[in-house]
A protein has these predicted regions:
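N-terminal first-folded block
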Residues: 2-50
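Aromatic side chains
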Residues: 24, 38, 47, 56, ...
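Residue-level recognition of the GNAT/N-acetyltransferase active site
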Residues: 53
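Conserved acetyl-CoA pyrophosphate-binding loop and the N-cap/start of the following alpha-helix
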Residues: 56, 60-65
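Conserved acyl-CoA
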Residues: 64-79
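C-terminal structural segments of small proteins and small subunits
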Residues: 75-108
Length: 111
């Protein structure tokens, strides 16, 4: 996925930040399919937990959600702390996102 906008939409799939709920959400045909929760503070976004509803698993929606969230963090100039194992695993598998994690924190996250 390329740089994030306010919402990314592809044939019935939409991803957007829901700051009032402190999470990014992915919807399929208008139905909430998953989310990744975060906390922000002083130029940092910490990803805490990611969930994709069982009925939507196996479609790559989690990866799309996290790519969008990380692209948005980059656009906003936020450093990333991947406390969520899914986000951490995504970054390990997509090294072009490692630079979002402060160098001093990479060892703690096995990056």
């Amino acid at each position: 996925m390329t740089a994030a906008s306010n919402a990314a939409e592809t044939i019935g799939v939409a991803v957007a930040d829901a700051p009032e709920r402190e999470r990014y959400e992915i919807h399929v045909d208008g139905e909430l399919a998953g989310f990744t929760e975060y906390k922000t503070r002083r130029g940092i976004i910490a990803f805490i937990h990611t969930e994709v509803d069982e009925g939507f698993q196996g479609r790559g929606l989690g990866d799309r959600l996290i790519a969008y969230a990380l692209d948005d963090a980059r656009k906003r100039g936020l450093a990333v702390l991947p406390f969520c194992p899914f986000v951490r695993s995504f970054i390990q598998s997509h090294p072009d996102y490692v630079d979002l994690v402060p160098e001093s924190q990479r060892g703690a996250f096995e990056l």
